[in-house]
Structure formats: structure tokens, C-alpha cells
Design a protein with these regions (language model features):
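Extended, charged low-complexity segments
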Residues: 144-201
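Intrinsic-disorder/low-complexity loop/linker signature
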Residues: 49, 126-127, 182
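Aromatic- and glycine-enriched beta-alpha-beta binding-site module
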Residues: 32-103
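Low-complexity, flexible helical/coil segments
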Residues: 47-54, 76, 110-116, 158-159, ...
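A generic structural signal for short, solvent-exposed coil/turn residues
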Residues: 7, 30-32, 68, 112, ...
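N-terminal ordered "arm"
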Residues: 2-45
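Charged linear interaction tracts used for macromolecular binding and regulation
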Residues: 72-153
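Noncatalytic linker/hinge segments flanking ATPase motor cores
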Residues: 22, 51-59, 82, 116-122, ...
Length: 201
């Protein structure tokens, strides 16, 4: 039961930029809750011998103001392009059943509100990252290049506890429409992050 995933990640949440919850889970969100989409695009991956490269999984979460209080609501979307076997394997990894970074979040999740197969479009040009899921989700973030930085390199947050990576590039959303699993929010203009991710278990 070995698996390995490599790809790109981005998120968009309801906090102002940058999200204090990402700096540390016990900081407290800017508003009453932290409502977030986490988009993982698997460039290359294999789970128990099943190839899952090219597929996307964007979990949606609604958490209390202080994330460490737990009782998160989590919904998982699996790429409609996945076969039944691929969907089963991805669901096992992203729900934490097969260990890895998502398993570390397990104690914080109070309710898994659903898991759906939906059409997903994922775009990444290096600075802009976008995911569209059916008619309910359309999220795009752009990495932030600080004023005066001639190299064009975006700003980063390092040394954090985060399932995707301990180093995250700071981003801001241009689109933030999220409607799924009974969760409806618009995070346009709010916080975002992006990063490569490499998981194994």
C-alpha cells in the first residue's frame, strides 16, 4: 500500500491577505470563520499501483475562527475524468485514510459533508492559478510580487505547518466563488497561497 503524489497546489480563503490561520492554526481567522478551497493538481502520481497523474482534487473546508478548536466541515471533490478506481484511491489519500499530510488534519475534522465527482478545469501559468468545478466553483489567485522587487519573484511564507508545503507563495484572489456541499461563500479579493507539493506514504 505505497503511494506518491507530486504536483501543484493553491488555496483561497475568506481571510484578508495573508491568512493568519496559515501562519499558525491557533492565530484566529480575520472573520468569524475560515472558509477555504484547497486545490491539488497531481502532475505525477501512483497509489497502490494505480496511475493518478493529471487529476485534480479540490477539498472545500469551513472551519471555526480558531482552527485548532476542530469541528471542521470538509467536502471533497474528485475529478470527473477519474475512473472509479482512481477516484477511490484519490479519495483515500485526500481523506487521510492512507496517512500522509491530510491524516495530520484528521483530528480537526468534525464532519465530512460529502464527496462528489465533478468536471474540473485546472490552469497554472506559474503566477496565476485557477480551478473551475462544475457551475459551483470558480477560483483564481495570483502570486504577489512585492513592489520594487526587480527579480519578479513573489513573496513567500516559510516555516509553516501546512499539508501542502512548509513554504508557501503568498497570493491574492481575482475570483473566489465557492458553492458546494451546502457551503456558499465568495472569497474574491481575499487571501491565497500556492506551492508545489510532494507527498508519499
Amino acid at each position: 500500500m505505497a503511494w506518491k503524489l507530486d504536483g501543484t497546489y493553491f488555496e483561497n480563503c475568506s481571510c484578508e491577505m495573508p491568512c493568519p490561520c496559515t501562519v499558525t492554526f491557533d492565530a484566529g481567522a480575520d472573520y468569524d470563520r475560515c472558509q477555504v478551497l484547497l486545490a491539488f493538481n497531481v502532475r505525477e502520481g501512483e497509489i497502490d499501483g494505480v496511475d493518478v497523474g493529471g487529476l485534480t482534487a479540490p477539498p472545500v473546508a469551513d472551519t471555526p475562527k480558531v482552527m485548532t478548536e476542530g469541528n471542521w466541515k470538509l467536502g471533497l471533490v474528485i475529478d470527473e475524468a477519474a475512473s472509479d478506481e482512481q477516484a477511490e484511491k484519490l479519495g483515500a489519500v485526500f481523506s487521510g485514510q492512507m496517512g500522509g499530510p491530510m491524516a495530520a488534519l484528521g483530528p480537526l475534522i468534525g464532519e465530512v459533508v460529502g464527496s462528489d465527482r465533478m468536471p474540473i478545469e485546472y490552469e497554472d501559468d506559474g503566477l496565476r492559478h485557477r480551478v473551475r468545478v462544475g457551475d459551483g466553483i470558480d477560483v483564481e489567485v495570483e502570486d504577489v510580487v512585492p513592489f520594487g522587487v526587480e527579480s519578479g519573484e513573489p513573496a513567500q511564507l516559510t516555516g509553516v505547518f501546512h499539508p501542502a508545503n512548509s513554504t508557501l507563495t503568498i497570493a491574492k484572489s481575482h475570483r473566489g466563488k465557492i458553492s458546494a456541499f451546502g457551503m456558499d461563500f465568495d472569497n474574491t479579493g481575499r487571501s491565497g497561497f500556492s506551492a508545489p507539493f510532494a507527498w508519499s506514504g
